[in-house]
């Protein structure tokens, strides 16, 4: 409960500058509701007047028509201002999330499941819309109209006001609270399974080409279907509770209307109120449940919204693995030195490296070999300052790596991952990554060196040809050479190749390795689990059991 109150308080603080707009939404909601209740009550009143021999007042009918039109306008105003706040805040949340991710990367994306992040950016942020558009205004509206209605019923009878108060309280407070506690564990389980399924689906989508080549796509589809059915079962459990809640809400309304009508009948029989007033109060009561039903439906939507808020604030509160506390800039990286370095990943106790002493020098191709998971890539991620060491010292030239500006350091290093990263952009944009100082002549010069110039120029629009991971116009070997082009265009001091040939045949492996040897100037790190891949390196190190030694 305390956790939920903190979340709600924090969400309100996040949009406090928009509270006047929320008040506008409440204003339109309250007056729209009062008009909704007033119209049938006025029609009943006019009907009784006609039955008692009175004349139908045309002016009253005109007023009713105006009120009916106004009801539509008030309804529009309520939704417009409520959703204006919601979508404005959602945009702010997304900006905050992307800004935070920029501060957390690359370590965050290195350790975070992409499916979970996509779910957070898309589905979780969308779920917050329920809080901003369908929680604050309805709660305030419900509170105001309940006070107005209770005072109205009290004008006729204490018993009627007590019945109304009881029914409204059950609908707006008791039912939401009871079902909120029941829904919470189901929603948490549902979130976990949806996150897992999203990740599994994305992995399947990205690896579809490999699945087709291996002929195991049918088995993968079966697993996807199985996972989907599990998610659907969890969804059904939530839906059942939601249906049960609706049933209790309408059962409460049914008993409430019956009790109200019975008391009305007794009061008429005792001549404490007139038949006309009894019918009007019953009509008002029967048409007054909309805001309270909206509140009774909150547990599901609000439960999801609060769950989403937890995930969102968890990310926004996350500390960066590496702060950008350094302000030094290295002119050129000539030497990398590790002295008594201990390292473990954030929030993990197991040491990956212990008392590591190591020295890498400029203008050498360094081979790093070892079993999968031995720490080869981790060693390079420490050099790139994705993570900081637990203890010891890492120096670039004579400067402590902690004193060097992280972004400036990473500008000096070109990292080529195992799997080529292709963005849904033109070939030029994929290669330059926003660097407008790189000319087309430079791109084509490097393309010729990497034996890709003819292939690029033969595409539909040359460098302006749009490519993406789905529209494959390059082979695996050519995609790896595109990555190499991207690295060479960066003109870095250090090149890190992480298993660059693990997915290539012998011919393409030979092409890539020769291109690396011929074109990469400066310090080159070649990570592989195969000795044959690093055989041409100037020096080879083996990473094993938390140590790195020359072989």
Q: What is the meaning of each model-derived region?
A:
Residues 1-36, 52-60, 78-82, 86, ...:
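Membrane-integrated ABC transporters
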Residues 213-216, 240, 288-317:
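Cytosolic ends of transmembrane helices, especially the final helix of ABC transmembrane type-1 domains
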Residues 95, 314, 395, 403, ...:
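ABC ATPase nucleotide-binding domain helical subdomain, centered on the C-loop/LSGGQ "ABC signature"
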Residues 14-16, 106-107, 123-132, 136, ...:
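An intracellular "coupling" helix at the cytosolic face of ABC transporter transmembrane type-1 domains
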Residues 17, 21-34, 67, 134-189, ...:
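Transmembrane helices of ABC transporter permease
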Residues 4, 32, 36-48, 67-114, ...:
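Juxtamembrane helix-loop junctions of ABC transporter transmembrane domains
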Residues 60-75, 168-171, 242-258, 275-300:
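Hydrophobic alpha-helical segments in the permease module
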Residues 384:
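Helix-to-loop junction immediately C-terminal to a conserved catalytic motif
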């Amino acid at each position: 409960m305390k956790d939920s109150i903190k979340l709600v308080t924090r969400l309100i603080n996040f949009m406090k500058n928009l509270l006047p707009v929320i008040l506008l939404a409440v204003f339109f909601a309250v007056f729209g509701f009062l008009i909704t209740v007033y119209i049938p009550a006025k029609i009943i009143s006019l009907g009784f007047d006609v039955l008692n021999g009175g004349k139908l007042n045309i002016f009253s009918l005109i007023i009713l028509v105006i009120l009916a039109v106004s009801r539509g306008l008030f309804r529009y105003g309520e939704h417009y201002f409520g959703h204006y706040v919601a979508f404005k805040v959602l945009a702010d949340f997304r900006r905050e999330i992307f800004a935070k991710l920029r501060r957390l990367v690359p370590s965050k994306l290195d350790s975070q499941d992409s499916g979970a992040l996509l779910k957070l950016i898309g589905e979780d942020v969308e779920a917050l819309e329920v809080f901003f558009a369908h929680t604050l205004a309805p709660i305030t509206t419900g509170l105001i109209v309940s006070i107005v209605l209770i005072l109205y019923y009290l004008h006729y009878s204490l018993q009627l006001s007590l019945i109304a108060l009881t029914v409204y309280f059950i609908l707006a407070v008791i039912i939401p609270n009871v079902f909120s506690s029941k829904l919470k564990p189901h929603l948490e389980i549902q979130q976990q399974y949806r996150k897992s399924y999203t990740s599994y689906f994305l992995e399947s989508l990205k690896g579809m080409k490999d699945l087709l080549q291996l002929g195991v796509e049918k088995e993968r589809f079966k697993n996807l279907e199985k996972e989907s059915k599990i998610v659907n079962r969890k969804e059904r459990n939530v839906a059942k509770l939601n249906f049960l809640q609706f049933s209790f809400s309408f059962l409460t309304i049914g008993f409430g209307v019956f009790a109200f009508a019975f008391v009305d009948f007794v009061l008429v029989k005792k001549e404490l109120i007139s038949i006309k007033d009894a019918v009007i109060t019953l009509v008002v009561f029967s048409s007054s449940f909309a805001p309270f039903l909206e509140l009774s439906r909150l547990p599901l939507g609000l439960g999801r919204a609060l769950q989403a808020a937890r995930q969102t604030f968890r990310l926004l509160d996350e500390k960066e693995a590496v702060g950008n506390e350094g302000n030094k800039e290295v002119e050129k990286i000539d030497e990398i030195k590790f002295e008594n370095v201990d390292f473990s990943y954030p929030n993990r106790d197991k040491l990956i490296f212990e008392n590591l002493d190591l020295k890498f020098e400029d203008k050498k191709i360094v081979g790093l070999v070892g079993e999968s998971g031995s720490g080869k890539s981790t060693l390079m991620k420490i050099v790139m300052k994705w993570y900081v060491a637990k203890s010891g010292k890492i120096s670039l030239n004579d400067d402590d790596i902690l004193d060097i500006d992280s972004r400036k350091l990473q500008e000096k290093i070109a990292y080529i991952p195992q799997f080529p990263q292709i963005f849904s952009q033109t070939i030029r944009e994929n290669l330059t990554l926003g660097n407008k100082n790189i000319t087309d002549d430079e791109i084509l010069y490097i393309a010729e060196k990497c034996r890709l110039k003819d292939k690029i120029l033969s595409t539909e629009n040359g460098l302006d040809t749009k490519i993406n991971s789905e529209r494959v116009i390059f082979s695996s070997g050519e995609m790896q050479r595109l990555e190499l082009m991207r690295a060479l265009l960066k003109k870095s001091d250090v090149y890190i190749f992480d298993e660059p040939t693990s997915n290539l045949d012998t011919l393409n492996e030979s092409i890539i390795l020769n291109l690396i040897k011929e074109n990469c100037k400066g310090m080159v790190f070649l990570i592989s689990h195969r000795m044959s891949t690093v055989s041409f390196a100037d020096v080879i190190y083996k990473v094993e059991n938390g140590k790195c030694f020359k072989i």
